[in-house]
Amino acid sequence: LVSGGGKHTHHPSINAKEVYLEAGKDYAITIKYSNLYGNAEARMLWSTPEKNKLERAVNLAEDSDVTVLVLGLNERLEGEEMRIDVEGFSKGDRTALDLPLEQRELMRALVATGKPIVLVLLNGSALAINYAQEHVPSILSAGYPGQEGGNAIADVLFGDYNPAGRLPVTYYKSVDDLPDFEDYSMKGRTYRYFEGEALYPFGYGLSYTQFSYDAIKTSGRLAADNILNVQVTVTNSGDHDGDEVVQLYLKDEVASTTRPQVQLVGFKRIHLQKGETQTVEFRLDARQFSMINDQEQLVVEPGWFTLYAGGGQPNKKQTESSVSARYKVTGKPMPIAF
């Protein structure tokens, strides 16, 4: 039963129940619904229940060389104020970070076949896929890729395109890693303040090739009206052409108030043929070094800062190569206009 299809409901709900109908018999069906706003709509659909779906999936996997397993979420699970209340998902809110239960059971059953699995995830928010990380050799996060998504995913899986995506959020191992929802402080939240070990950190992503980094060089003097130039040399040291997303992070070593562990201050996507080397330049202004002090002033405090450049966050086991350099700001606190 499709309900809530009127103009005031953007997301109709589908209510289903399995019933037994004997062949050759007539059945009277009554549908009752209320019309609260006008233009209400109710439709009845039917389909034959599919039995033993899990068994069928296992049989297909056992008869295949490789299984491409597509799992994930949709707008009903992670949209706003959805009419859904199942394990891990409540009316558009996430009560856990796991995949839906049926999907987790399917993945475990397919892993048990011993056949290679490529997991493709379709999702918009973070997932705790700890089991997949341990048991699935290849995972592709595809987001919600649109009508050409199938072709794009196939290009990546068959090696016609070298992937270079980077995670825009942190993938935590569990909601237990996060502060209480009613705790509004930043402590323990996002890559900037999370001190635990993430499943996949913000900025993480793999390629079919490898990249190496040379030392960071800085030039210029940071001032309220001046720019600090930062250069880093990147080499495609692998066997394939590909894109690299060069990420530049900043750490304030000593500050008068709480500062992020690191913060992203720049990134650039570059394409390098195998064996090619390129110098990437970033231009940093004083605002990117600034903070709000105890007097609620936006300032750059004097002291040491560390710059990190690499294909991901610094000091993470998932980041293959990164380099760093220290830079000292001297003088008095530098006020910055809001």
What is each residue range found by the language model?
Residues 1-338:
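C-terminal non-catalytic regions of proteins with extracellular/luminal or membrane-system context
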